[in-house]
Amino acid sequence: MSVIATQMTYKVYMSGTVNGHYFEVEGDGKGRPYEGEQTVKLTVTKGGPLPFAWDILSPQCQYGSIPFTKYPEDIPDYVKQSFPEGFTWERIMNFEDGAVCTVSNDSSIQGNCFTYHVKFSGLNFPPNGPVMQKKTQGWEPHSERLFARGGMLIGNNFMALKLEGGGHYLCEFKTTYKAKKPVKMPGYHYVDRKLDVTNHNKDYTSVEQCEISIARKPVVA
């Protein structure tokens, strides 16, 4: 029997650096894990106002809150099975201009609340680039491909940040999900996601986000 209820809350504790600037973020979220819907309110508690675009942090809070993904019955849900022991993930983000982010997450559960401890490191963002100039305008919807390897779930996808004045800033995401106990492994599949910032103050020290996340088999399989 699953320990995950139809409605859950979660807490986010994130700390890290971007081009040497230290910051901390805390958040409170809620949603419906089996429907793939979630919202979160986030606050920069240290290091604000941030001298870089919020958008490089936003996926770590929701495309990071992986239990809130709607799975069909014929695809085993690797992440939900991992509880109550929980799971971890590690991520590398390679941007087209040579900037790199490494991220880790430790996800646990207590009652009807998930807790996410996130560590973030961003390096080599050009001072005149869209991240340090805060010229990004949110992520396009995307699809992550997922496959099993060595008891872990490997995710890979290309994501695109919209830019002021048009165009995109591209980034390749590689994520490794690791359950803290043996679980039934899914086959090759995809997760479609749409992440939006729905509200924020002027300097992005207070941000609200929502995400829809749905797993599926390949369309032409």
Curated annotation (Swiss-Prot):
InterPro entries the record matches: GFP (IPR009017), GFP-related (IPR011584)
Q: Which cysteines are joined by disulfide bonds?
A: none
Q: Which residues carry this modification: (E)-2,3-didehydrotyrosine?
A: Y63
PTM info:
Contains a chromophore consisting of modified amino acid residues. The chromophore is formed by autocatalytic backbone condensation between Xaa-N and Gly-(N+2), oxidation of Tyr-(N+1) to didehydrotyrosine, and formation of a double bond to the alpha-amino nitrogen of residue Xaa-N. Maturation of the chromophore requires nothing other than molecular oxygen.
The record's comment on protein family reads: Belongs to the GFP family.
Keyword Kinase attached: no
* Keywords for this protein: Chromophore, Luminescence, Photoprotein
Describe the subunit structure: Homotetramer.
Q: What mutagenesis or variant effect is reported for H142S? A: Produces a fluorescent form
Write out the GO biological process terms. bioluminescence
Also noted in the record is:
The wild-type form is non-fluorescent with the color being pH dependent, ranging from yellow at low pH, through red to blue at high pH. The His-142 mutation produces a fluorescent form.
**What practical uses are noted?**
Fluorescent proteins have become a useful and ubiquitous tool for making chimeric proteins, where they function as a fluorescent protein tag. Typically they tolerate N- and C-terminal fusion to a broad variety of proteins. They have been expressed in most known cell types and are used as a noninvasive fluorescent marker in living cells and organisms. They enable a wide range of applications where they have functioned as a cell lineage tracer, reporter of gene expression, or as a measure of protein-protein interactions.
Keyword ATP-binding in annotation: no
Q: Please describe what this protein does.
A: Thought to play a role in photoprotection of the coral's resident symbiont microalgae's photosystems from photoinhibition caused by high light levels found near the surface of coral reefs.
What protein does this entry describe?
GFP-like non-fluorescent chromoprotein
Position of the 2-iminomethyl-5-imidazolinone (Gln-Gly) cross-link: Q62-G64
